[in-house]
Amino acid sequence: TPLFPFGFGLSYTRFDWSDLKVTEQGDNFIAEISVTNTGARAGSDVVQIYVEDANPIMPRPLRELKGFSKLHLEPGETKTTRIILTPRSFAVFDVESHEWIARSGTFVIGAARNAADIVSSTEINRSSEWRSKP
């Protein structure tokens, strides 16, 4: 058993996260979240974006890391980061058809400090299916 979850790290300051928004832009979804350094020292924090299929029809991991962004913040500073989720971010490889498939349906988008610490999450609905040969 691992001692620390994937993405775990320590800092000499504190960060607050707020306002997770996920918006649809064409075939992509854009995840945005604001991070504020609430401590007395400058520091860096990493926002990790995980995707979870709410109703999987094929075997896949419960939660998959699909993007991340490292932010350096001075004390009291707030920055908003944007992470683009393409159709491939929602896809799973189908060994029978030999292609990547992102099905339509409900997915949970989570913003996390590490794999075990989901700070905020929201559901999105993909309205179309996407396929791609490797």
Question: Where are the language model's segments positioned?
Answer:
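Intrinsically disordered, low-complexity Pro/Gly/Ser/Thr-rich segments with frequent PxxP/GP/PP motifs
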Residues: I57-V95
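Secreted, periplasmic, or luminal enzymes acting at the cell surface/secretory milieu
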Residues: T1-S44, Q48-E52, K70, P75, ...
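Edge beta-strands of extracellular beta-sandwich domains
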Residues: S120-I124
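Intrinsic-disorder/low-complexity, polar/charged segments enriched in Ser/Thr/Lys/Arg/Asp/Glu/Gln
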Residues: N28-E32, T78-R82, V119
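Short coil/turn motifs at secondary-structure junctions
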Residues: T38-A40, A54-P56, R88-F90, A116
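Short, hydrophobic/aromatic beta-strand segments
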Residues: A42-I49, P61, F93-E96
